[in-house]
């Protein structure tokens, strides 16, 4: 099997299959490309995903009646998101040149500060300033957001417990001090639980930012390989009902307003992303984690394992498997049930079928009778270690909450005397309970 990208020897002067004049430098999808044609090919994938009139320059009545769109681009300063920034600014540059300084939309870059979390090799703020200079005269604004801003209202924090039949309850905690997000995440027993909770945090912060910045469109730089990775990871984590939102463009309702989520690079393999980055000299802007990556399987997160799987497929010439996975996932629509759905009060996802009923059917809840003193001693040790698993009789002064299967799995793995503390979502009075005026976004926040 051939590699997804094959670089050619330019001394052989093999003509480009597209323009027929320039020398081809690589082969992708069995086609020979010169540098300019390959860059144009990748940019064309983004244009295909964003053909809506609202992203085009408007004149006359259309300009008066339709304000300029604001588009939020999530930027981690990884290779994929950097390529997406380059692709989007190339579109804006074309509009700027063809329409005498006009742009069809305003681009807002959002970076969620991971400097300490991932031990990044440099400040993202410095990179963002360099990017703004690189793409002048295109007007780009950027925001750097702290992870700690996820917990704005301490009164929303409550302790969550699960009893033996998988019913979840929330319990008020003493607010004699403020809890930081770092303290909450420190309760995670493993990297997979931490990864799952961080995904919930990122999604929420991105939607909050889109709301406050009046951005109606949100762009993710996920490649086809990344989307295939997410499909497998979501399946393993028990979040299969969310796959349809990960695979294709869709709308999300947040605070009674719809936001369009678009994956402009969903038709591009990660190997092609790397080639584009190399040819466009974007590698110098990439920010990487300095944390050593574990090679021991048990120390890897679910996403680490699925990423390694697709990396091996790329290395062995089976990169097209990602396309098959995405096409299969693309056939999955939103779950359809006649019963009324509810909202998970941990992650906010829609619950179409109560996971408790299914878990009770497949789980043996009653243990065999304890016969020896040793067995009784082990049972007591287990009860002390499993502080989040409580018996139904101890549910007084606790409020039942709705929780999805994925969050049930994540929370049940957390064992700590303080329990699992998390900001509970209350859909009925969400806007009243959250403190929007304390949510501060700046484009000059210190990244460290």
Swiss-Prot record:
Look up the record and name the pathway of this protein. Answer: tRNA modification; 5-methoxycarbonylmethyl-2-thiouridine-tRNA biosynthesis
Q: Which GO terms describe its molecular function?
A: nucleotidyltransferase activity; sulfurtransferase activity; tRNA binding
Q: Source taxonomy lineage?
A: Eukaryota, Fungi, Dikarya, Ascomycota, Saccharomycotina
Q: What is its main location?
A: cytoplasm
Instruction: Indicate the family of this protein.
Output: Belongs to the CTU2/NCS2 family.
HAMAP family noted in UniProt: CTU2 (MF_03054)
Protein function: Plays a central role in 2-thiolation of mcm(5)S(2)U at tRNA wobble positions of tRNA(Lys), tRNA(Glu) and tRNA(Gln). May act by forming a heterodimer with NCS6 that ligates sulfur from thiocarboxylated URM1 onto the uridine of tRNAs at wobble position. Prior mcm(5) tRNA modification by the elongator complex is required for 2-thiolation. May also be involved in protein urmylation.
What parts of the sequence cross the membrane? none
- UniProt keyword annotation of tRNA processing present: yes
Q: What is this protein called?
A: Cytoplasmic tRNA 2-thiolation protein 2
Q: Where in the cell is it found?
A: Cytoplasm
What GO terms fall under cellular component here?
cytosol
Show the disulfide pairing: none
- Enumerate the Pfam families for this protein: CTU2
